Amino acid sequence: SPPVCGNELLEEGEECDCGSPANCQDRCCNAATCKLTPGSQCSYGECCDQCKFKKARTVCRIARGDWNDDYCTGKSSDCPWNH
């Protein structure tokens, strides 16, 4: 089925989906189009802060056991597994 903008599920073709325009509280996301607002790089994620990607080498997941800390790349809002 085609993506539905406004259902709070990020689907193919959408950059963000914060719900209906009446309920959206995300200034990084245009609720009517499910696209990022002008100047925004992201709207969510461990490596997203105030609509921008966090700087590279920012810790996004603390080490546990034998694993190393995980770091933002500066190019994505996702926190990659670096172990």
Swiss-Prot record:
Disulfide bond: is it a keyword of this entry?
yes
| Motif position, Cell attachment site | 64-66
PANTHER family according to UniProt: ADAM A DISINTEGRIN AND METALLOPROTEASE DOMAIN (PTHR11905), DISINTEGRIN AND METALLOPROTEINASE DOMAIN-CONTAINING PROTEIN 28 (PTHR11905:SF32)
Q: Which cysteines are joined by disulfide bonds?
A: 5-24, 16-34, 18-29, 28-51, 42-48, 47-72, 60-79
- In Swiss-Prot or TrEMBL terms, this protein is called Disintegrin isoform D-3
Report the residue ranges that make up the Disintegrin domain in this protein. Answer: 2-83
Expressing tissues = Expressed by the venom gland.
Instruction: For this UniProt record, give its keywords in alphabetical order, as a comma-separated list.
Output: Cell adhesion impairing toxin, Disulfide bond, Hemostasis impairing toxin, Platelet aggregation inhibiting toxin, Secreted, Toxin
Q: What does this protein do?
A: Inhibits fibrinogen interaction with platelets. Acts by binding to alpha-IIb/beta-3 (ITGA2B/ITGB3) on the platelet surface and inhibits aggregation induced by ADP, thrombin, platelet-activating factor and collagen.
Q: Which GO terms describe its cellular component?
A: extracellular region; plasma membrane
Q: Which family does it belong to?
A: Belongs to the venom metalloproteinase (M12B) family. P-II subfamily. P-IIa sub-subfamily.
Something else the entry says is: The disintegrin belongs to the long disintegrin subfamily.
Localisation:
Secreted
Q: Name one GO molecular function term.
A: toxin activity
Subunit structure comment from the entry: Monomer (disintegrin).
PROSITE patterns noted in UniProt:
DISINTEGRIN_1, DISINTEGRIN_2
Q: Which Pfam families match?
A: Disintegrin
